[in-house]
Every structure is written in C-alpha cells, then in structure tokens.
Design a protein with these regions (language model features):
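Short, intrinsically disordered, charge-biased short linear motifs at domain edges
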Residues: 4-16, 57-67, 179, 212-215, ...
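Signature of N-terminal electron-transfer/Fe-S-associated modules in redox systems
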Residues: 17, 26, 35-36, 53-55, ...
Length: 432
C-alpha cells in the first residue's frame, strides 16, 4: 500500500538541479565549518536528497542523521549564486522522513506531543508553563542541579536552555487595542507568538510600547495561534498547515496596514505560508496576501521612521544577525539603522554575525552538543567586541545568547532590538 501523499508543494527536478555544486555555500554553513564533512554541507545534503527523491533510494539512518544535523539557518541561500531555495528542500526532506522513517518510540512520542498536542493549544502551553514555573521558583530546580540528577539523566546541557517563565503571561493582552501616541501613522496587528507569550511577555509589552510611541495603533487579535515554524522546520507539515489556516482566517479579517512580529523565526514562516500550500489550494492566494502584509518589527520601524524622543544610552552594543531575519527574510540593515538612531550608542559590528548562534528553533534541544560548539564560538566573538550588550532580533536567539553569557561568564546583557529602543524611549518620557 502506497503511503499518503505529503500535503502541499513537492520539489521538482529543477529545484535540485539549480545546485551546480560550486561550493560557495561551504564557508557559510555552520556544520561544514565545524566538521569539514561534505555530507554535512548544503551541497552534500542536496546530493543525498537527490538520491532519495529523484533516484528512489531508501531513506537510511545516515540520511536522517545528516538532515537532522542541518540547522536550517539558510545561510547557504544567501551565499548561493544560483538561487537554490535550500530551506524548501530540507523541509520537504524532513517531511519525507516524518512520513517514511520509523523513529524510536520516545522520539516519535515526544515529537507528536510537542507539535500536535502542545503548540497548537494556547491553554496547554500555559498549563505547562505553570508547571515549569513551579519547578523554577519552588527550589526544585536548584535541588535538581545541586544533587546532579539532571546530569544523571543526561539533561544538564539541555536544561540550560530552559526559558525563565514569566510571572504574568502575555495571553491576557489578546483582544486588546492600544492607541497611538499622538497622530496615528499606521494601524498594525501584532502577532505575539506562542512560547513568547509565557517567556517573553516583557519583550511583547516593549514591542507595543515602541510601536505606539512611534504613532502606531496596535491591535492584538484574540485567539491567535503558534505560527507553525517549528512544525514546518521539523517536517511535521500537517500541523504547520493547520496552524497556518487558523492564523490566515484570523489575521486577514483585521483592517490593518501591516502584521507585525518581533520574532524573526516566526516572521520568516508567516511570510512564506504560501510554501505550505499548492497553487491550486484556496489558502495559497490567502497566504500570499498575508505574507505581503507581514513585517518584522525592525523592518517596519526602519521604513516608517522613528519619531519618538529617545534618551542617550551610553552603551557599547554589538548585534547578532538572526538567521531567519538575515537569510530567511533578507533583512540586514533595518535593525542596524534602528540601533544607530539611539543617541550616544556605540555600535560595533560582531565578527561572523551572519553565522548561526546554534539556537535554530529547537536545535539546541535536539542537537545540544553541536549547538554548544556554535555558541562557544559565538561568545568568543562577542567578547572580542568588548560590548556591554549583545542585541538580536529573535526570542530563540535571545535564549541561546543569554545561556552563552551565563555559561561563559561574559557579563554581557542580551536584549532584543526593541527592548533597547524601549529603554531609550522610556528614558525620554517626562517623569510624572
């Protein structure tokens, strides 16, 4: 009996044939830079995909291993002169693995719970967050670390990346509308994410303050869902498509000039919802309209222009490019433009800022050793700048870099671009 078809578009011969094996992607690829193994380079992985997809070779343990080790950072797309859309190819390969490869019971159960039974349900995210918050604040975390039980279970490294759960969740802001300060320059709908609602509430609040301070009316649509990025990157395409449909139906009802996100990983997927649907599907045209209105908050503010007063910040700051902002959305200058607009800020470029920090969605949980290698290199470069603050544009990168600052004792603060803008704007407000 034939397996069911994979929903959505399928790569064709021409998509793979664009790769001419020139090798210009090699130095851009984090895993190739670490190991210098052809099979763990973009062109090496494409060669393996061709064997499976075009030559009908079986999916082997080796194939799965090399595809799993890819961060899907898409730096190879930036480097590629032939326009290979590697992200589409690797995510389809993962969808094939999801359908055809028998993972272990534990791996299959974990993936099924995370992608199909947790992320699509905000109330379950909140319930799990409350349990984690109890673990973090009751003293259990300190005890577990102190007696070595995490190390015994092989969880010590992964637990470093466990986000600090907020006291108040951002979900209570869903359904609210925030008026612009002064004349209204734009009306925007804010996409608040999923995990960010319980771990980055302050970032979401700062995003709203910065937008309203710069003349934007901000509506936070009620009952919005996870964007589906993590599911799409993992090859769980059915879950990603279901989430996309829900967000399309919700946000396309909003009368707004733009749909704003402060998460580069979410933004890349939101802009590319059409990649999840075939051209003949009704959702494809809806997804194209949705993507055309979606903007990263740094992209939107840089284009709109900052008009809020800002207090000088005497800080030396460096910026780590978020992969799905730089490589996925091709946005490099917008965050730098905003940082340079802050009075007295000393901005210094981070060496190799275009190389992934190792977060890559849940990569730091599934490929923890590799993630820590990339993080160690990133923190060495960050220390070389002598910056007091590392700035980035994605919550996942924030978690990774904050863990790096702790583990490597760099004594560097890690903030989102809008958090730094919010700090400067708050300092310029008259004291009541």
């Amino acid at each position: 009996m034939s397996p069911p078809p994979i929903s959505g578009p399928t790569p064709v011969y021409e998509d793979y044939a664009r790769c001419v094996h020139c090798g210009l992607c090699l130095n851009a690829c984090p895993t190739y830079r670490l190991w210098s193994l052809e099979a763990d380079s973009p062109r090496g992985r494409i060669h393996q995909m061709i064997q499976v997809e075009l030559h009908q070779q079986p999916i082997t343990d080796s194939f799965v291993e090399h595809i799993d080790k890819c961060l899907d950072c898409r730096a190879c797309e930036t480097a590629c002169p032939s326009g290979v859309e590697y992200g589409k190819l690797v995510e389809y390969a993962r969808a094939r693995i999801e359908r055809d490869y028998p993972r272990s019971w534990l791996a299959s159960t974990t993936r099924d719970f995370f992608f199909r039974h947790l992320l699509p349900y905000p109330h379950r995210i909140m319930d799990l967050a409350r349990v984690i918050r109890l673990y973090q604040r009751s003293g259990l975390q300190t005890i577990a670390r102190g007696i070595g039980v995490l190390k015994l279970l092989g969880l010590a490294d992964r637990e470093r990346f466990l986000p600090r759960i907020d006291e108040n969740f951002f979900y209570h802001r869903h359904g609210w509308t925030f008026p612009a300060n002064g004349p209204r320059r734009a009306r925007v709908a804010f996409f608040s994410g999923c995990i960010a609602n319980v771990t980055f509430s302050q970032l979401n609040e700062a995003t709203i303050r910065v937008l309203t301070a710069n003349g934007c009316e901000v509506v936070v649509p009620k009952e919005q869902f996870c964007c589906g990025a993590l599911a799409a990157h993992a090859g769980v395409r059915d879950a990603a498509r279901d989430l996309a449909r829900k967000n399309l139906a919700l946000f396309l009802r909003e009368d707004c000039d733009a749909i704003i996100t402060n998460a580069a990983g979410c933004g890349s997927t939101l802009k590319e919802y059409d990649h999840l649907f075939s051209p003949h599907e009704e959702e494809h045209s809806q997804a194209r309209a949705f993507g055309a209105k979606t903007r990263d908050v740094t992209e939107f503010l840089a284009a709109l222009g900052l008009n809020a007063k800002m207090k000088p910040l005497s800080l030396r700051v460096t910026y780590q490019d978020s992969c799905h902002l730089l490589h996925g959305q091709k946005i490099r200058e917008a965050p730098r433009t905003l940082l340079r607009a802050i009075p007295s800020l000393d901005f210094v470029e981070l060496p190799y800022s275009e190389i992934c920090c190792g977060s890559a969605g849940v990569y730091n949980l599934t490929q923890t050793g590799t993630s820590l290698e990339l993080l160690a290199e990133k923190m060495r470069h960050a220390q070389s700048t002598r910056a007091q603050t590392i700035v980035t544009a994605n919550p996942g990168c924030l978690l990774q870099l904050r863990a790096g600052a702790t583990v490597h004792h760099t004594n560097q603060e890690v903030l989102h671009v809008v958090e730094l803008l919010d700090r400067a704007i708050a300092g310029a407000r008259p004291q009541k």
